[in-house]
Design a protein with these regions (language model features):
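Nucleotide-activated donor-binding/catalytic signature segment of Leloir-type glycosyltransferases, i.e.
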Residues: 258-285
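Short hydrophobic beta-strand element within catalytic cores of glycosyltransferases
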Residues: 296, 314-317, 321-324, 334
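Conserved acidic donor-binding segment of nucleotide-sugar-dependent glycosyltransferases
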Residues: 336-337, 341-348, 357-363
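Carbohydrate-associated surface elements
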Residues: 168, 189
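N-terminal subdomain of nucleotide-sugar transferases
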Residues: 1-63, 239, 383, 403
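Acidic donor-binding loop of glycosyltransferase active sites
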Residues: 92-96, 160, 272, 288-305, ...
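Conserved donor-binding/catalytic core segment of Leloir-type glycosyltransferases
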Residues: 4, 211-236
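A short, well-ordered alpha-helix in the C-terminal region of glycosyltransferases
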Residues: 350, 357, 364-379, 388-391
Length: 403
């Protein structure tokens, strides 16, 4: 089996998108399949049309001409993507074209697939229109939103098979009129061997951050508005009334960071919060080891209700204690009171109470940690998830032969 993966971006850029991609490629190689990787102009400027990064060979796509006219820019990008996909496909001769979100990859892949007689699998990791709302480039229900949704639905209809990352997105796809038997969930997972459980804290790092003797709450990830970190800061102000030793460790960065710093100052808790900044991936474990309770207070919106995140799975793999809002993406992953704790989304007071509940129930910590680890080991390994592609590819090949 030879698969050409068409990607928005990949290494050396690090993101949840990249982590999922590399996990898929690694497991597909373990199955004996040959994979080829092509990134689109959203990778950014590249020195050459082919590049080796961390042992992976990537084909790159030249940048799209700079155009500010909405619609024309995307059309030019898709035209450039189609030309490059065709060029690479003719060179590597794949059996399958596997396009991953966004739709700007899917439609060119479908066009090239029809030209070369190749089946196309489209992996919808998030809907393009909801991602645009998240990035602030449109609003739900706007003309651009509706046009983006129509384009996404058109791509879903044109693909031979569809994969997605969770049940929430699967229901959304079927709700667009796509046949249910055309859609397969390939759930997010973790490489449990990559995460240490119960590793001792780095005391030098603890001292450097001023966390000696502290009860540490934490979040590690991107600081976007939908993550609800403002609620976590508000909850900290409440928790400090009963637990003056509490501190909040925020590791990462993002567009919402200035607003978070201002909120901390307004509430008078700026000296109780450590903004550690972005840290190299190889160093992230050291920060995890300092945190007593992780928090994932995502706000409720279409994106968070439909899409499952990776972070809670990583927390379970490390036997971490965590609380999370009860958005749909979290409910699909977390068994309340068993592998983690849920609280009503958007409610800072409930978040504070839930964190206090965890801190006050130390006797249950070993059971919670073991249950989380067991869940990912038994249900959310990448080997288990990626094995599902075998049937997807077989159906795509059969559909193309029958057409």
């Amino acid at each position: 089996m030879r698969i050409l993966h068409i990607l928005d971006h990949s290494l050396p850029l690090h993101s949840g998108y990249t982590f999922r991609t590399i996990a898929i490629l690694r497991e597909q190689r373990a199955l004996g399949w040959e994979t080829f990787q092509l990134t689109t102009p959203r990778q950014g400027a590249c020195a050459a049309l082919e590049e080796d990064v961390d042992g992976w060979h990537f084909y790159r796509t030249p940048p799209t001409p700079s155009v500010v006219v909405p619609g024309l820019r995307e059309w030019l990008e898709m035209r450039g993507n189609a030309a490059r996909i065709l060029e690479v496909a003719r060179a590597v001769k794949p059996n399958i074209l596997h396009a991953h979100s966004p739709v700007l990859n899917a439609l060119p892949a479908i066009r090239v697939g029809r030209c070369l007689g190749l089946p196309v699998v489209y992996e919808m990791r998030a809907s393009w229109e909801d991602a645009a709302v998240d990035h602030g480039s449109t609003t739900e229900g706007s003309l651009r939103y509706r046009a983006s949704r129509a384009l996404e639905t058109h791509a879903l209809r044109g693909a031979d098979q569809i994969t997605t990352i969770c049940e929430g997105l699967r229901r959304d796809i079927v709700g667009r009129g796509i046949a249910a038997d055309k859609v397969t969930v390939i759930p997010n997972a973790v490489d449990v061997t990559a995460f240490a459980a119960g590793s001792p804290p780095d005391e030098a790092l603890r001292r450097s951050l001023g966390l000696e003797g502290a009860t540490v709450l934490g979040f590690i990830g991107s600081f976007y508005a939908y993550e609800g970190l403002d609620l976590l800061i508000e909850a900290l102000a409440t928790i400090l009334q009963q637990r003056p030793e509490a501190r909040l460790l925020l590791v990462g960065g993002g567009s919402h960071e200035p607003a978070l710093r201002q909120l901390a100052a307004d509430l008078g808790v700026q000296d109780k919060i450590i903004f550690a900044g972005r840290v190299p991936n190889a160093q992230v474990q050291r920060y995890y080891d300092l945190i007593d309770v992780l928090a994932y207070p995502r706000r409720s919106m279409r994106l968070t209700e439909l899409v499952t995140p990776l972070k809670p799975l990583e927390a379970m793999a490390q036997e971490r204690l965590f609380v999370a809002s009860d958005v749909g993406g979290h409910r699909e992953l977390i068994r309340d009171g068993e592998t983690g704790f849920l609280f009503p989304a958007g409610d800072a007071a409930a978040l504070a109470r839930t964190i206090a509940r965890v801190l006050d129930n130390r006797a249950a910590w070993p059971r919670l940690r073991a249950a989380g680890r067991h869940f990912v080991e038994s249900e959310r390994t990448w080997a288990r998830s990626v094995a599902r592609y075998a049937d997807v590819y077989a159906r795509a090949l059969a559909a193309r032969r029958a057409s």
